[in-house]
Swiss-Prot record:
It comes from Synechococcus sp. (strain JA-2-3B'a(2-13)). This is 3-isopropylmalate dehydratase large subunit. Gene3D superfamilies: Aconitase, domain 3 (3.30.499.10). It is an enzyme of class 4 (lyase). Its EC number is 4.2.1.33. The lineage of its organism: Bacteria, Bacillati, Cyanobacteriota, Cyanophyceae, Synechococcales. Catalyzes the isomerization between 2-isopropylmalate and 3-isopropylmalate, via the formation of 2-isopropylmaleate. Heterodimer of LeuC and LeuD. It catalyses: (2R,3S)-3-isopropylmalate = (2S)-2-isopropylmalate. The keyword Amino-acid biosynthesis applies. One of its GO terms (biological process) is L-leucine biosynthetic process. Its cofactor is [4Fe-4S] cluster.
Amino acid sequence: MSERTLFDKVWDAHTVRILPSGQTQLFIGLHLIHEVTSPQAFAMLRERHLPVLFPERTVATVDHIIPTDNRARPFADPLAEEMIQELERNCRQYGIRFYNSGSGRQGIVHVIAPEQGLTLPGMTIACGDSHTSTHGAFGAIAFGIGTSQVRDVLATQTLALSKLKVRRIEIHGKLGPGVYAKDVILHIIRKLGVKGGVGYAYEYGGSAIEAMSMEERMTLCNMSIEGGARCGYVNPDAVTFEYLRGREFAPQGSDWEEAVAWWKSLASDGNARYDDVVVFQAADIAPTVTWGITPGQGIGVDERIPAPEDLPESERELAKEAYAYMDLQPGDPIVGTPVDVCFIGSCTNGRLSDLREAAKIAKGRRVAPGVKAFVVPGSERVKQEAEQEGLREIFEAAGFEWRDPGCSMCLAMNPDRLVGRQISASSSNRNFKGRQGSPSGRTLLMSPAMVAAAAVSGKVVDVRTLL
């Protein structure tokens, strides 16, 4: 068949059958689990006396609730200790590969799977976490799922899903200095809206995407969900193959060449039919900062907060709610907004290249008085490699705290939390009310380099002035 997208090809290759409901029973090649959304799923298996059908296709780690400042057991938070003990027990009982703290492999689930070569082109991947879309950077179809679906994958290695439409999003041209993948995805969400992708898979392409590293592509695909899409992906290419070459769980030897040949065949056909195509120009994308309470409420760092009358009518009431919550006014420049906390990390921006870019800004500077700034590597491997490169010394010399891997302040299910009305500059993915631990805390989303710039300035600044 011709005129097929990668999504079509991967979907068809993993289709078990069409269910009476019209949904597709889809085989899941890799299942990733963590301590927060898996305990109830295992409990449901026990209630029904069901085994894990393919334990070798499931990989577990701890990331959401684990503290990043003190790993001594038992953890100070009894709930964290209980949930991690439960995951340890479940993995032992069912023979599931488990990367615990101190193994050298622990980290945020969407960081460790790619870095070990577990994530491969053409896979279907599921995890009880919405940012599973990250793995689409490799040309995989990856979904976040709920706890009952975690149970289904454990028991059957399949999911019942409705096939998505496909929207191709092209970014043409070259990104300017100080503009990163985080700015690209925030720009896309700003333009298409937080509900614009509902019912879609996003296929990213164009010269700006092709020029991105794999870690940048992961950032892009990671936040597809914030744009309403169920998943996002990039067609595999030479950049993909070079990243995967030699990684532990990637094909080796003669299997490698065979795998690459198949991966190449997965790319969307030149005449593939899309349900929609949207084109952006890289030159129009500036360092971007969110000012409101959804990831779609973002502006270029050199812009002012929009007035209600400048927004579509459907967005005006939410904008008024955001002005009040954030204590920001229409017409205010986003530059100069003071910050209390600066967080670099998360499955969006906790990889080695993210830390390198932030370190370039931190080097030779100091965190501003009154600002708490900390860096949370996305995995134990990222932490080790960053330390070998001297990044830890750069950050600590600048006054940043250097932490152990975990989700940290992205969702604050751990001790890393805002207090009261504190406002954070954050490299994470969501800025909802109360997202970072305090019911009244405020979040400004931006790239890691922009976070570092805010940390040393005590306020939002244009990172391009510090390059």
